[in-house]
A protein has these predicted regions:
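Membrane-embedded helix bundles of polyisoprenyl
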Residues: 2-3, 102-116, 120-206, 218-241, ...
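Membrane-interface coil-to-helix junctions
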Residues: 7-109, 129-151, 244-249, 257-286
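Juxtamembrane "helix-exit" motif on the non-cytosolic side of transmembrane helices
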Residues: 15-17, 137, 207, 324-334
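Periplasmic/ER-lumenal interhelical loops and adjacent helix-loop junctions
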Residues: 29, 37-42, 47, 70, ...
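Membrane-helix interfacial "entry" motifs
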Residues: 60, 87-95, 120, 139, ...
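Alpha-helical transmembrane segments
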Residues: 96-103, 126, 148-151, 187-191, ...
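Cytoplasmic membrane-interface regions of multi-pass membrane proteins
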Residues: 168, 203-212, 299-306
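Hydrophobic/aromatic-rich transmembrane helices and adjacent perimembrane loops
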Residues: 336-351
Length: 351
């Protein structure tokens, strides 16, 4: 009910400004066009036409269907819902899928909290709200709906990692890996690095308890889960990765990363912790309003010493360093060019 009320307020703001989700950035030219193609293809399946075109120039986004359009949501299970919308409600379909992904991000955040042993319902609810309505969702998710896939699957992947650390089956993690890769390989690459950082921090907190042998076994289990997940979604993952590696934009966009950003960038980054700024600042949009900032301040000023607090501090410092140096943005972007489209990871930690 709370999310519905907040979503309604958001829609009323757009209506008051005579704005539309589809008119933002690449809405009509890219995301809406691909979403229409996905909807029409799915409807053809329902009417008995099971032929999936491998090449289609009509969308105007590139050459092959799977390799190019996976970035825009071909393979994303959420897009299956497009078949339920009539031809005269396509704008509503576009808005619904954005808000639905935001809602699912809150659910997956709550599930992660449950898996990690965070039982206080008030804390989980507040964290979910901060995560769902963080700057990345309100700016990135509105302009580019596919950006929400990174937010949606990160908590699931971290929950799967927790299950492995708790000596449970790797099946949940493997399925999450497959779904995340099939939904968007680009953000799954970033989530893989974020999960690697998470695993290292968690293992560092238990290195005396676990010992070298157990740590190596856990790393092998994680690797096995990732490989299994890739195999499950290989029919979509492999063509997508191949297309990305042979993309002319990647070949021409490689640039040398500077050692540091400008002073203006750091000023905006600090403000971005508690404000939703109108500019993306190189997609450094990690803000979780005053609630997330208050949580970080309490974490570093608290006299309570615990393993969990220590791990949170280490994780925050690591992500902050990556936000502060251009190399961090370049690494997270496949070493092509500098951008912090992974900044929802910081929003997750602050929430």
């Amino acid at each position: 009910a709370g999310f519905l009320a907040a979503a309604l307020i958001l829609l009323l703001i757009f209506a008051k400004e005579h704005a539309s989700f589809t008119k933002m950035a690449d809405g009509v030219a890219q995301h809406y066009a691909v979403l229409m193609w996905i909807r029409n293809t799915l409807r053809q399946f329902l009417h008995g036409n099971f032929a999936l075109p491998m090449v289609d120039f009509s969308v105007g986004q590139g050459f092959d269907v799977i390799g190019t359009l996976n970035y825009y949501g071909v393979g994303d299970p959420v897009n299956l819902l497009t078949v339920f919308f009539a031809d005269n409600h396509l704008d509503q379909m576009y808005m619904f899928l954005i808000l639905f992904r935001m809602y699912l991000s809150g659910l997956t955040f709550s599930y992660y909290c449950s898996t990690a042993g965070i039982q206080r319902k008030a804390s989980v609810l507040c964290g979910s709200w901060l995560y769902v309505f963080c700057s990345f969702a309100l700016i990135g998710g509105m302009k580019h709906p596919l950006f929400l896939n990174g937010m949606l699957y990160l908590p699931l992947l971290l929950a799967g990692t927790e299950k492995v650390l708790q000596k449970k089956s790797i099946r949940f993690l493997s399925v999450s890996v497959a779904l995340a890769f099939m939904s968007n390989y680009y953000f799954m690459y970033m989530n893989t690095i974020l999960c690697g950082i998470y695993l290292c921090v968690r293992l560092f907190g238990h290195y005396r308890e676990y010992g070298i042998r157990k740590i190596l076994l856990l790393i092998l289990k994680m690797a096995a889960a990732w490989i299994w997940g890739i195999c499950l979604g290989a029919v979509i993952i492999l063509p997508s990765v191949y297309a990305f590696l042979h993309n002319a934009r990647v070949d021409t966009a490689v640039e040398e990363a500077q050692n540091f950003y400008s002073i203006a960038h750091y000023r905006k980054m600090i403000l971005g912790f508690f404000q939703t700024l109108p500019m993306t600042n190189g997609w450094t949009v990690h803000g979780t309003a005053i609630g997330g900032l208050a949580g970080v301040l309490m974490l570093f000023t608290s006299k309570k010493r615990s393993r969990e607090n220590c791990q949170l501090k280490i994780g925050f410092v690591v992500l902050l360093v990556l936000l502060c140096i251009p190399f961090g943005g370049k690494m997270m972007n496949g070493f092509a060019y500098v951008t912090n489209r992974w900044s929802y990871g910081m929003a997750f930690l602050c929430a």
